[in-house]
Amino acid sequence: MKKIISVLVVFSMLICMSGCSGTTDIEKRAIVQIVGIDIENKQYKVSMQIFAPDGEMLEKKGGAKADVVTGTGNSIYYAIKEIEMKTGKEVFLGHNMLLFLGESARNENINDLLEYFTQSEYVFPGLDIVMTNGKAYDFVSLKLSTGLISSQTMEDILKVSIQNGNAKRAQLAQVVADVRQIQKTTAIPIVDITEIAQDVQVNSDSEDKKTQDTKVLSFSKTAVFKDNRYIMSLDKEQTMGLKWLTNEVKNAFSSIDVNGVPVGISIDKAKTTLRPHITGDKVVIDTQIKISATASGNLSLISKNNSELESLIKNKIKNQIISQCENTQNILLKKYKADVLDIEKLLRYYQRSFYLESRDDYERVLENTSYDISIKCDLEIH
């Protein structure tokens, strides 16, 4: 017990010392909340949402304020140095929650784009990386009628999209680990800015409403990289298949059609277990998916007794999941031969001898890989 306490004390001292190691006063630091990277005229354009007491109010009334500052240079380093010259402050990335990579940066080497952040002393390893359709600057500077959208709100939108199966999380530490694998592959969510019509109250003294377009963030695709380069995008269904086959679905929402009646499915709990085995020169991955789900809707419109209805809905759910998984593995393994399914990790752990013998011809391994999927579904009907 004394040893444990001693270790904790030393660890605490190290944390305190590391926190105090810099000599820069907080007033001299530019506290960055969001970063965006674009390529313009063969130059890097870096956009930052920076905490600023005298800046523009964020969307939550009474909340913090921020400025959006940009810098350009022939490297990310020099673009950030320009931001420091403009602000007169040292950029601090320790509070940064999101890194947007613009569409113009999509064809750049992903490892090179992230190098500055991986080498920075204070960058949070859980930093979320997101590709954008359009300019990253537009996302960093996105405004509502009440001001700039805060990093916390954007992070919350991403979390909800991940939960709903629309996005796959890509955090800095994980992406860096991914691109150190044989194929240098990784998958990163893609975000769009879309406009929706929304009824808003004209003023507080009137019940009259008017329709106005509101900008919202939406996730529906996933960028796939191979050899550190962007190669293709997965759609929403393929993204969900990717999440099933990498045990990233914990809960999700979807809908199915049962005899012409729409039924909402809430997956409250899910787990995927994967075990590879070798048959000749082929890899078969035994895949067991266990889910607890709830079905809701106008189920009385379906002319089935409870037992038949439960069986019918279960089969619909299973078929939907299998379709998503098969679609994903076909496009990734057969067409693009890109391992963002963590197959290398599975082989290295469970079939190490085979992995060592075959890694020099890894694309052939992927072509000869298949999944044997079984699904167990516990269902409640409301």
Please name every model-derived segment.
Residues K3-V9, M13, M17-H382:
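Membrane-proximal alpha-helical signals and transmembrane carboxylates
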